[in-house]
Swiss-Prot record:
It is an enzyme of class 6 (ligase). This is Formate-dependent phosphoribosylglycinamide formyltransferase. Involved in the de novo purine biosynthesis. Catalyzes the transfer of formate to 5-phospho-ribosyl-glycinamide (GAR), producing 5-phospho-ribosyl-N-formylglycinamide (FGAR). Formate is provided by PurU via hydrolysis of 10-formyl-tetrahydrofolate. Its EC number is 6.3.1.21. The lineage of its organism: Bacteria, Pseudomonadati, Pseudomonadota, Betaproteobacteria, Burkholderiales. Keywords: ATP-binding, Ligase, Magnesium, Metal-binding, Nucleotide-binding, Purine biosynthesis. Mg(2+) binds at residues 274, 286.
């Protein structure tokens, strides 16, 4: 039986989020609705999640000493990584010492903090189908990997980055140096290391939200949400929809792959498993041990959205992955480089039938920074996609003055 305390009292159940962007913000709201005391941590002040948490803390999360000091001072029951750029070896040390429980596990946080750990686990340890790949530490190694079998076209990504930063497609030899330079500029931390992948001519790509939670028997069970289709531009999601129609054999393969990788990572919580699909064939791409940006669509489509599923699972509560309605999401970009932007057209966006708008509250806007998302539901995904994109297009961030 799960027992929850009262926030801001000696009985409080305390959860610390490491990373407090738009996804963390929704997790924090879901936790607060269950009476959890929340601590939002980020590298900058007034991050979206910090605006709604009981406590806001700002540190360099990649600094092991700062991370250790904060966890020991706050004494949370659970630490929930929401980004990759964290001192994960320190989390492993603290978890091994019994200081804190890391979600889903400290090992999972370490393996998924960069593309190398999780790709080697999936392809080499678990034998899951993936694109051909090589890891490279220099421009010369990158060229040799391409010439040695990866071939063109191919995709180059920093081993650590998010939201498509530093990712590009190479169509021929003339693009190799530019791709290397772009990857070096776009990495989350200065690793100087990339993965180059052979290009898979897939029909579509999906995110399969996979939940490990305690079932009625008291044992950990794996549940799947309906597959989410999405469109990416330069590796960054711009729209998603649910459910993505799939051949039954492809869906079964996707679920087997997701089950295998999440079972190995262990722990409890929601995982975003990214997969490529062509006909009945499925290839593993990536996994995040936390809610996924493409999964924001579940705020319009599921009885329990991905953030509520994550919150419930990590607290040992029952989960329900049932689809409520077809729906879609479309990103609202900043469009301008400014602090404290204002948003015109929200009223017009909400006049689109069966839509909602979420503005993240980020203190600073960039041209390609996600500042919000439009959500829509309908009787079919095509109508929902049209509505979401129309609503998003009506919201116009602008600089003040």
């Amino acid at each position: 039986m799960t027992t929850l305390g009262t926030p801001l009292s000696p009985s409080a159940t305390k959860v610390m989020l490491l990373g407090s962007g738009e996804l963390g913000k929704e997790v924090l709201i879901a936790l607060q609705r269950l009476g959890v005391e929340t601590i939002a941590v980020d590298r900058y002040d007034n991050a979206p999640g910090q605006q709604v948490a009981h406590h806001a803390r700002t540190i360099a999360m990649s600094d092991p000493d700062q991370l250790k000091a904060l966890i020991e001072a706050e004494k949370p029951h659970l630490v929930v990584p929401e980004i990759e750029a964290i001192a994960t070896p320190m989390l492993e040390t603290l978890e091994a010492a019994g200081t804190v429980r890391v979600i889903p596990t400290a090992r999972a946080a370490r393996l998924t903090m960069d593309r190398e750990g999780i790709r080697r686990l999936a392809a080499e340890s678990l034998g899951l189908p993936t694109s051909p790949y090589k890891f490279c530490d220099s421009l010369e190694e990158l060229q040799a990997a391409i010439d040695g079998g990866i071939g063109y076209p191919c995709v180059v990504k920093p081993v650590m980055s998010s939201s498509g930063k530093g990712q590009s497609k190479i169509d021929g030899p003339e693009g190799v140096k530019a791709a290397w330079d772009y990857a070096m500029a776009g990495g989350r931390v200065s690793h100087g290391r990339v993965i180059v992948e052979g290009f898979i001519d897939f029909d579509y790509e999906i995110t399969l939200l996979t939940v490990r939670a305690i079932g009625a028997s008291g044992q950990v069970e794996t549940r799947f949400c309906a597959p989410i289709g999405h469109v990416q531009v330069s590796g960054d999601y711009v729209e998603s929809w649910q459910p993505q129609p799939m051949h039954p054999a492809a869906l079964a393969s996707a679920q087997r792959i997701a089950q295998a990788v999440t079972a190995d990572l262990g722990g409890m919580g929601l995982f975003g498993v990214e997969l490529f699909v062509k006909g009945e064939q499925v290839w593993f791409s990536e996994v995040s041990p936390r809610p996924h940006d493409t999964g924001m669509v579940t705020m319009a489509t599921q009885w329990q959205n991905e953030f509520e599923l994550h919150a419930r699972a990590i607290l040992g509560l029952p989960v329900d992955t049932t689809l409520r309605s077809p729906g879609a999401s479309a990103v609202i970009y900043g469009g301008v480089e400014a602090q404290g932007v204002v948003f015109d057209g929200v009223d017009q966006a909400l006049r689109v039938p069966q839509t909602e708008v979420r503005l993240f509250g980020k203190p600073e806007s960039f041209a390609r920074r996600r500042m919000g998302v439009a959500l829509a539901y309908a009787d079919d995904i095509d109508t929902a996609r049209t509505r979401a994109k129309e609503a998003a297009s009506r919201v116009r961030p602008r600089a003040v003055g």
